[in-house]
């Protein structure tokens, strides 16, 4: 089968590999659509310690069931599904609490298993969910990440919020903030095209940097800041923009080390929460939102769909500042 394989830093290659066969309880999907995630761009640049080349990445995907392993009864050949890419033990305290994203031995399809940048991918059958559209189905996973981040932010009606980063997770976060009752939703991104696109998702203010949103009279202006980038600078900015008692949720994964003012956190009673992946319930909510066919903006100028063969060029474009918030590869 054909694969898009990360072979070295800043190198994606179209290669061939044997088609995998599902074990008991697993299924093989003929990949229909797979999104390029910001964490994969970080890996591509050599900034993500979880990913090591050579690797077939791809954890945001949909596909058609092509083969089922022994004992699988919940899906059948021909079904169009998406899949939760988290593979966990099911026995540790976190799994037993319904918090599989914290599993002590968690693994992820596209990192620890070959991912969906290939014609075929293997997934656990009990983590598959029916979707109505192949392209939309590849957007469930990033939406589940946004669902968790906004849930951790504990938005109240009338809250003010800012989202740093107008990639797809940032944009989905904007939409969810609006649905949660936030009245002022600002978006920060250096890309002018992405800022314009954020209005389609419900942004009320846009700026190329956080300083442009803050005033001398109100240097700390927001109840909540969601950092969907993950740089040291954006993490520090997220704290500097909060009112006293404000909440910062970090969902972006990029730089490992960040120097913070601990006294500021104490004196202003700030909350800082990390947000990683999602619970099963949050993933299921994302499936429901996508299948409602009402969540995503009708105007899709934020999305571009390309062939797998265009994958190497797409990675280069995205790291150099693409106007598209999401590129999905198809077969």
From Swiss-Prot:
Region forming the signal peptide:
none
* Organism for this UniProt entry: Sulfobacillus thermosulfidooxidans (strain DSM 9293 / VKM B-1269 / AT-1)
Which taxonomic lineage does the organism of this UniProt entry have?
Bacteria, Bacillati, Bacillota, Clostridia, Eubacteriales
Q: Which Pfam families match?
A: ADH_N, ADH_zinc_N
Tell me how activity varies with pH: Optimum pH is 9.5.
GO molecular function terms listed in the Swiss-Prot or TrEMBL record: oxidoreductase activity; zinc ion binding
- Describe the temperature profile of activity: Optimum temperature is 50 degrees Celsius.
**Pathway named in the protein's UniProt entry:** Carbohydrate degradation; L-rhamnose degradation
The residue stretches assigned to a coiled coil in this entry are none
The cofactors it requires, by name, are: Zn(2+)
What protein name does the entry list?
Answer: 2-dehydro-3-deoxy-L-rhamnonate dehydrogenase (NAD(+))
Q: What does this protein do?
A: Catalyzes the NAD(+)-dependent dehydrogenation of 2-dehydro-3-deoxy-L-rhamnonate to 2,4-didehydro-3-deoxy-L-rhamnonate. Also has weak dehydrogenase activity on butane-2,3-diol. Does not show any detectable activity in the presence of NADP(+).
| The protein's Enzyme Commission number | 1.1.1.401
One of the GO biological process terms: rhamnose catabolic process
Q: Which UniProt keywords apply?
A: Carbohydrate metabolism, Metal-binding, NAD, Oxidoreductase, Zinc
Q: Where is this site: Important for catalytic activity for the proton relay mechanism but does not participate directly in the coordination of zinc atom?
A: 141
Binding-site residues, Zn(2+) 1 = 37, 59-60
């Amino acid at each position: 089968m054909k694969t898009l394989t990360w072979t070295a830093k800043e190198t994606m290659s179209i290669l061939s590999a044997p088609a995998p066969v599902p074990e008991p309880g697993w299924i093989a999907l003929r990949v229909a659509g797979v999104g390029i995630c910001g964490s994969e761009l970080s890996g591509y640049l050599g900034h993500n310690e979880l990913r090591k080349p050579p690797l077939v990445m791809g954890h945001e995907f949909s596909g058609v069931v092509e083969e089922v392993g022994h004992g699988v009864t919940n899906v059948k050949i021909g079904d169009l599904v998406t899949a939760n890419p988290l593979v966990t033990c099911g026995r540790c305290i976190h799994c037993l609490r319904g918090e599989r994203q914290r599993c002590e031995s968690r693994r992820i399809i596209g990192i620890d298993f070959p991912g969906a940048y290939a014609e075929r991918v293997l997934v656990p059958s009990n983590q598959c969910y029916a979707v109505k559209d192949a392209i939309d189905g590849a957007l469930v996973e990033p939406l589940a990440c946004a669902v968790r981040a906004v849930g951790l932010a504990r938005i109240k009606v009338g809250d003010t919020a800012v989202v740093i980063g107008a990639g797809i997770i940032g944009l989905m976060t904007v939409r969810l903030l609006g649905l949660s009752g936030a009245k002022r939703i600002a978006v920060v991104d250096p890309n002018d095209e992405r800022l314009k696109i954020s209005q389609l998702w419900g942004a009320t203010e846009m700026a190329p940097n956080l300083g442009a949103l803050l005033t001398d009279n109100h240097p700390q202006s927001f109840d909540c800041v969601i950092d969907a980038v993950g740089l040291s600078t954006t993490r520090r900015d997220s704290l500097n923009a909060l009112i006293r008692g404000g909440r910062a949720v970090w969902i972006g994964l990029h730089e490992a080390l960040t120097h913070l003012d601990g006294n500021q956190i104490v004196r202003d009673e700030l909350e800082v929460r990390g947000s990683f992946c999602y619970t099963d319930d949050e993933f299921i909510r994302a499936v429901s939102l996508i299948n409602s066919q009402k969540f995503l903006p009708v105007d899709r100028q934020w999305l571009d769909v390309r062939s797998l063969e265009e994958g190497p060029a797409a990675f280069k474009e995205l790291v150099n500042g693409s106007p598209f918030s999401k590129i999905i590869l198809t077969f």
